[in-house]
From Swiss-Prot:
Subunit field text: Heterodimer of Msh2/Spel and Msh6.
Region Disordered, annotated ranges: 1-174, 230-249, 824-843
Biased composition (Acidic residues): 109-126
Keyword hit for Transcription: no
Role noted for this protein: Involved in post-replicative DNA-mismatch repair.
GO cellular component, one term: nucleus
UniProt protein name: Probable DNA mismatch repair protein Msh6
Native source species: Drosophila melanogaster (Fruit fly)
Pfam families, alphabetized: MutS_I, MutS_II, MutS_III, MutS_IV, MutS_V
Length: 1190
């Protein structure tokens, strides 16, 4: 098949591109030979013929080409996009006999403008990716200002990379990507990496090579533009990067440069100058195109190949937006979706209404959404992904008070619409702030320049070092304040009659009691409201305000250790009391995390919202005995009914992510998108029919899921425990599970589900929508009037009469010629027919009025039908509270089922007994297992703290690697499991409630914070000493080892003494055996050690000593730490170990002599009454001294 090929990029003539880029003084007219495209609809043989037209070059000579294998697309449905990168192929030189090139003559450089394009059904499901396009609608070239009416659609063929395997290896260029972009790097840094690699590395994987010299990389025009060079680049206000107010999100593009561009190219540069830190997915017809530096990103990150032409250009079809944007967002990029918001006809009409310049004569395009990891919203083009973790956006506002700070915080999950606000005082270590980011780790941090103290900036650099950061204005008209935030919310969302009742409870609490309009902030929450304003500002900047704010659910954030001070009215969503687990404890005990953590061990949840609830339980275990007991009983009952448990887990397994589905359906039904004139309300989507299908299919999947959940009351109708009854039974049976039958019945009968799933259009049933029913009633009434009038006319003419005509010429009276003489002046002749049955057609004032009424009724019906899907989603969202209550019940059931599943897998399990009113805090553990360890190889341990026979503080000694740290972690994790209500792996467990767990485990410095190992230890210990209560559990591992022995011993002894006086449950491990001597008779302290068995201990050669670890907690102290055994296990040379042993013996002897001497001196003091006893003691000490060999 003969086919002319277009040399232009997107239909742009090569000469035009040369003209507009040649105006840049740095432009170099390098010739690029375009690669061959094939029609995606062409037959296989036709594609091979086109491929064969590209010759191979061998030793400078052309040779016949063999048919190339079918090209495998860079990213396909059955290959994970995030997998190994495909090697890119270079553009090969073409022969003189290549097909004749066709050059379109147009003023616009971007093709594929919107038109009357009707996609084929097969195309709609195509998710393949080309280097630019597969098939497009009529281009803007066809819709130029001279010819606004679209021409006949032509195909745009797909680029083929003719990298034949038979080509000599000497002519192949390996194109393996070597760029590693750190998550959190700015767009400019990433772009700089791309460009610098392009200039410096001839084997850079994304550079299209010059056909005259395969070893010379092409430098794209955008890489040579003067205003993009590092020493020239400025923001839109003309500020250089070293300016304190430099805005990295904008770019200064010279007006002279813009004026030399074509309308379409200028349109791209204008959008890019306002969003320089974004990758623009620029809609051109049916495709999203990436130009210039964005094309580099597409090639490097998405596996695209460059389109032919003089500037960098790549792209993909509209249907692949979700996949491509997800890949870039996950890699730390910001993606701006640019849509066409008018058709060529609309553009023509617009140009007629204004005095249009040449730059006005291009279809309008607008940014509809900017997406990064913290602003993900699941709209019609974005599917809900498999990740269940929330993606929080965090804003922090600080008031520096010298040695400490007051923080206002707002963190939100845009995918669900959860807004958390709070304000609190913090200590100099920022403990509460660290706990917040540990419990709710953000993916995006909003930062007001120069508004944070050094200690807070240090947290941002270290703890939040790997996440995205976005600046928010601190001054100027866009600066946020509490007053501005309340004013904006009042004007857009909560104004109107009864506005006091419109405000959410949390926001009402943050307003001044003296201002009934709600525009004055409470002094205690000014910082929190300012943080909320910063989040709203950024959401608005990303075009998400009407999508996120209307579904916002506000919750008060109170630091876990401050819950007791929370007002009941505003803390109603919080549990009465929780255990506090700070950032250090979460990390040291590995409570949360994807691998080898307590969360990953216990997580057998079937639903994503269940997984999120389990995460919340583990971060905030309950301190309410009644809550814990209810959970224990429910888990026990689930364990005793394994059949029902597996049935319910099978029921829950296929459930969608209902929480995100609710937010998505709310977005689909949100009329404020149109009311607030959001660009998405004007966007022209070529796959809109497919999106409508997907919307309805997803909606019906949600309805099916809720329908399936209505089986739960029947499945658990015989349950006995209080909690299971509450979360599975209907209100009439004493439960809290909502009765959804009425709502589900309505949506089941409102429309034909099968037809809607196939067509993407709702065919409503009577009673579904009042406005639709009213319109249909109006149509029915007009039809009755038409019938009545027709009967009257038949009586008048004395014959049978029918209506004739269609559309605007309907309802003409078709009167036989033989009776037409009875028509008087009130009848208007509209036409007549000849032949066997001649007739005349008349209209009257009555028929014209009936036609007008019918058209009005039909217009109303069509308007309702067009908006019917949105109204259906809106009705669903109106019952949000019921759906959410059902989700909460199911989430609790899922977590309980997960804990029951875990318990069923353990060899040993028990139900902990918790005591809330104990006189003395205690813990009794018998044969306990580490919950994350393999029980078959783990040695169980038991201990007692705070009982009648044992003191609350255990001074723990034992050999190196003997299991001291493991025991401490085991105790901490088992206590957490006990207080979330789980059954724990132990023979038995009894304890009083723990209000907080403190840990000081491991040895590590903090280089980024400038903290040494010892300073880190002391900071963590200081926190313990300040905040521990008698109900806390303290786990301290080898405190003092980071400094000199005597300093460390003294600090450790002082801390032990403090904790012993506090009488909190403590495990204090140490290798300082002087502490044992100091506290060995102290009744406040219990001595314990990790048992071991030693062979050849008295041997003079330490390398012959063998230590067998028994990993068993035993009463009493361990005489030494057996460090030489650890050295032997580590493979140290035996000579070094022996020499160390000799030195150790000498040091021990010196220390012992000093100790004995001190006792002799003490023994000689005193009066005559004790002289005899002291003389005897002195004789014993002298004997010991003689035994010391130095």
């Amino acid at each position: 098949m003969s086919k002319k090929l277009n040399t232009s990029v997107g239909g742009t003539p090569t000469n035009t591109l040369l003209n507009y880029f040649s105006k840049s003084p740095a432009f170099d007219k390098k010739k690029l030979t375009p690669s061959v495209k094939t029609d995606p609809d062409a037959s296989k043989s036709e594609k091979e013929n086109l491929q064969n037209q590209q010759p191979k070059v061998k030793d400078g000579k052309k040779e016949a080409s063999k048919p190339a294998a079918k090209r495998k697309l860079p990213i396909s449905d059955d290959e994970p996009a995030s997998g190994q990168r495909k090697r890119k192929r270079i553009v090969q030189p073409e022969s003189d006999s290549e097909p004749e090139m066709e050059v379109t003559k147009s003023e616009d450089d971007f093709s594929d403008c919107a038109s009357d394009y009707e996609p084929d059904e097969n195309e709609a499901s195509d998710d393949s990716v080309s280097s630019g396009a597969e098939e497009v609608s009529p281009s803007e070239n066809d819709m130029s200002v001279d010819s606004p009416t679209p021409k006949k659609s032509r195909k745009k063929s797909k680029i083929l990379n003719n990298n034949n395997n038979n080509e000599p290896s000497s002519k192949k260029v390996k194109l393996e990507s070597t760029i590693q972009l750190a998550e959190g790097a700015t767009f400019q840094e990433k772009l700089k990496n791309l460009q610098s690699n392009a200039k410096q590395d001839a084997s850079y994987d994304d550079i299209v090579t010059n056909t005259s010299n395969l070893d010379e990389p092409v430098v794209w025009p955008h890489q040579k533009l003067e205003f993009l060079q590092p020493d020239k680049i400025k923001d839109k206000e003309g500020r250089r990067p070293d300016h304190p107010d430099y805005d990295k999100s904008t770019l200064h593009v010279p007006e002279k440069f813009l004026n030399g561009l074509s309308p379409g190219v200028r349109q791209w540069w204008v959008l890019k100058s306002d969003n320089y830190d974004c990758v623009l997915f620029f809609k051109v017809g049916k495709f999203y195109e990436l130009y210039h530096m964005d094309a580099d990103v597409g090639v490097n990150e998405l596996g695209f190949t460059y389109m032919r032409g003089e500037f960098a250009h790549s792209g993909f079809p509209e249907i692949s937006f979700d996949k491509m944007s997800t890949i870039l967002v996950d890699r730390g990029f910001k993606v701006a979706r640019v849509e066409q918001t008018e058709t060529p006809d609309m553009m023509t009409e617009r140009c007629k209404r204004i005095k249009a310049t040449k730059f006005d004569k291009v279809v309008a395009r607008e940014i509809c959404q900017i997406t990064n990891r913290g602003t993900q919203v699941f709209g019609s083009q974005c599917k809900i992904g498999p990740n269940h973790q929330p993606n929080y956006m965090l804003a922090i506002v600080e008031k520096d008070e010298g040695t400490c700070s007051r923080y206002g915080v707002c963190f939100i999950d845009t995918s669900i619409g959860d807004f958390h606000l709070g304000e609190f005082e913090d200590d100099k270590n920022c403990s509460r702030l660290l706990t917040l980011v540990s419990h709710h780790m953000p993916v995006l941090f909003l930062n007001e320049k120069s508004a944070l103290s050094q200690r807070t900036q240090q947290i941002v650099r270290t703890v939040l070092g790997g996440i995205l950061k976005e600046p928010v204005p601190g001054n100027g008209k866009h600066a946020c304040s509490a007053e501005k935030t309340l004013k904006l919310l009042a004007e857009r969302y909560y104004a109107g009659p009864g506005s006091d009742d419109n405000w959410p409870l949390v926001l009402r609490t943050m307003q001044s009691d003296m201002d009934h309009l709600g525009l004055t902030p409470n002094d205690n929450y000014k910082l929190a409201l300012k943080a909320l304003g910063q989040c709203i500002f950024f959401i608005h900047k990303c075009k998400l305000e009407p999508k996120v704010l209307p579904m916002a659910r506000y919750q008060l954030y109170v630091p876990p250790d401050q819950l007791a001070d929370a007002k009941p009215a505003v803390a109603s969503t919080l549990r009465r009391s929780h255990m506090v687990l700070d950032a250090t404890t979460l990390s040291n005990l590995r409570i949360i995390g994807e691998e080898h953590s307590l969360l990953s061990t216990l997580d057998h949840c079937c639903t994503k919202f269940g997984k999120r609830l389990l995460h919340h339980w583990l971060c905030a275990p309950s301190c309410d005995v009644s809550v814990i007991k209810e959970r224990q009983d429910a888990i026990g009952e689930l364990i005793r009914m394994p059949t029902e448990l597996q049935e319910v887990r099978a029921l829950l397994a296929p459930m969608p992510d209902f929480e995100r589905n609710l937010a998505q359906i709310h977005l689909f039904g949100n009329k404020q998108i149109k009311q607030m004139d959001h660009p998405d309300s004007r966007a022209i989507l070529f796959e809109e029919k497919l999106y409508n299908k997907q919307k309805l299919q997803g909606f019906m999947a949600v309805l099916k899921g809720f329908n399936d959940l209505t089986k739960l009351p029947t499945m658990f109708h015989q349950c006995k425990t209080t909690l299971l009854k509450r979360i599975t039974q209907l209100p009439e049976s004493g439960g809290s599970f909502p009765d959804l039958s009425k709502e589900l019945q309505y949506f089941a009968t409102a429309f034909d589900h099968d037809a809607a799933a196939k067509t993407g259009v709702i065919a409503p049933q009577a009673g579904m929508d009042a406005e639709y029913d009213a319109a249909m009633d109006s149509i029915g009434e007009v039809e009755k009037r038409l019938k009545t009038y027709l009967v009257e006319q038949e009586r008048h003419f004395g014959c049978r009469i029918t209506y004739f005509g269609s559309d605007k010429k309907r309802y003409q009276l078709d009167v036989p010629e033989s009776h037409a003489s009875k028509a008087n002046k009130s009848y208007t002749l509209e036409g007549q027919t000849k032949g066997k049955k001649p007739s005349r057609r008349y209209t009257t004032a009555e028929t014209r009025a009936l036609l007008k009424d019918m058209q009005h009724a039909e217009d109303t019906r069509n308007m309702v039908l067009k908006d019917l899907a949105r109204r259906l989603f809106e009705k669903f969202s109106n019952h949000y509270d019921q759906w959410k209550q059902c989700i909460d019940c199911v989430a609790n059931l899922d977590v309980l089922g997960s804990l029951a599943e875990y318990a069923g897998q353990q060899m040993v399990i028990c139900v902990p007994e918790l005591v809330s009113d104990a006189d003395q805090p205690f813990i009794q553990l018998e044969e306990g297992y580490h919950p994350c360890a393999n029980a078959s190889t783990y040695i169980p341990n038991g201990l007692e703290l705070g009982t009648a026979s044992e003191a609350p503080l255990s001074l723990l000694t034992g050999p190196n690697m003997g299991g001291k740290s493991t025991l401490m972690r085991e105790v901490g994790l088992l206590v957490i499991m006990a207080q979330i209500g789980a059954h724990i792996p132990a023979a038995s467990c009894r304890l009083s409630l723990v209000d907080r767990i403190f840990t000081r485990l491991g040895a590590q410095d903090d280089i980024l914070a400038g903290h040494s190992t010892f300073l880190v230890e002391l900071n963590e210990t200081s926190l313990i000493l300040k905040h521990a209560t008698c109900h806390s559990l303290v786990l301290l591992d080898e405190l003092g080892r980071g400094t000199a022995t005597y300093d460390g011993t003294a600090i450790a002894a002082s801390v032990v003494n403090f904790l012993a006086n506090l009488k909190c449950r403590t495990l204090f491990s140490t290798h300082y055996h002087n502490l044992i001597d100091f506290f060995h008779n102290d009744k406040r302290i219990t001595l314990g050690h990790m048992a071991c068995m030693v062979e050849n201990e008295d041997n003079a050669d330490p390398t012959q000593e063998t230590v067998t670890f028994l990993y068993k907690y035993t009463a009493g102290a361990c005489p030494k730490s057996y460090g030489f055994n650890a050295a032997k296990l580590a493979g140290m040379p035996q000579g070094i170990i022996k020499r160390a042993y000799e030195l150790s013996k000498k040091v021990e002897a010196i220390a012992l002599q000093r100790k004995i001497t001190a006792k002799i001196v003490a023994a000689t003091a005193g009066n005559e009454d004790t002289k005899k006893e002291k003389i005897n003691a002195l004789k014993d000490l002298l004997k010991q001294l003689k035994m010391c060999q130095v």
